[in-house]
Design a protein with these regions (language model features):
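Phosphate-handling DNA/RNA-contact segment within nucleic-acid enzymes
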Residues: 11, 17-130
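Low-complexity, polar-biased intrinsically disordered regions enriched in Pro/Ser/Thr/Gly
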Residues: 3-11, 38-41, 166-169
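TOPRIM metal-binding catalytic domain and adjacent DNA-binding surface shared by DnaG-type primases
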Residues: 1-28, 79-84, 197-222
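Generic alpha-helical secondary structure signal
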Residues: 6, 39, 51-55, 73, ...
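TOPRIM fold recognition
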Residues: 84-85, 94-222
Length: 222
């Protein structure tokens, strides 16, 4: 569905490549990112991201005078495959991939800007030209910036979601995004009926016998 690869070259070996492919199936570039085992970007390195076109230029294999680089939304190549889907846009490619895993692409199709400041009308042109409905899902610390960007873009079928701010908790951190919220809500241990009773009654703990009774009788606490 998405085009994701792995670098095998030099000091970027093992890095993830997020390929930017446009609505005409043309490869614009690939963004290379270094991640730790926990899935977070490896900021311990001298640098932790790069672009394929920049690496080619450095190696003398890209003539910047002959080719004009213009990035596009990650996932844009899917726009015509799911013609009725609402377009959901986040900042991170990784987040788009995770969010899509929880959604039907016929209803919600996730894309990424590949950078907070990359949200511009030019990037959204292929979607605007198709009159698609677009919902922005900014990171927790980037909400106001994307609200301002949406106002500048001035497209009537563009809105900014409040979901990240609505479901955010302090433990998520200021850099949390929609994927972080989804993973926490979906993967969190389910509350037992005994725990629910304890919470609703404002108790620190519930008597073991009562908890056992709730479990044995399969009681539901409303």
């Amino acid at each position: 569905m998405y085009f994701v690869g792995t670098s095998t070259k030099g000091e970027t070996a093992g890095w993830t490549i997020w390929w930017q492919i446009d609505d005409q199936m043309r490869v614009r570039t690939g963004k290379l990112m270094a991640y730790k085992e926990d899935g977070h970007r490896n900021k311990d390195l001298r640098y932790s991201f790069n672009f394929v076109h920049a690496m080619l230029a450095k190696a003398g294999q890209w003539d910047s005078n002959a080719y004009e680089y213009k990035g596009c939304l990650f996932g844009l190549h899917l726009v015509d495959a799911f013609k009725d889907a609402e377009i959901c846009i986040v900042e991170s490619e990784k987040s788009a991939l995770i969010c899509q895993a929880f959604c039907d692409p016929n209803k919600r199709l996730w894309m990424a800007t590949a950078g907070k400041s990359a949200l511009k009308r030019e990037r959204l042109h292929p979607l605007i030209d198709r009159n698609r409905y677009i919902v922005l899902y900014p990171d927790y610390d980037g909400h106001e910036e994307w609200v301002a960007a949406a106002e500048r873009i001035d497209y009537p079928r563009l809105s900014v979601s409040e979901q990240v701010r609505k479901y955010h908790i302090p433990a998520d951190g200021d850099k949390a995004d929609m994927a972080d919220i989804m993973l926490r809500l979906v993967c969190a241990p389910q509350e037992t009926e005994a725990e629910k009773a304890c919470r609703l009654l404002g108790l620190q703990e519930i008597h073991e016998g009562v908890a056992t009774l709730i479990d044995k009788l399969d009681l539901t606490i409303d």
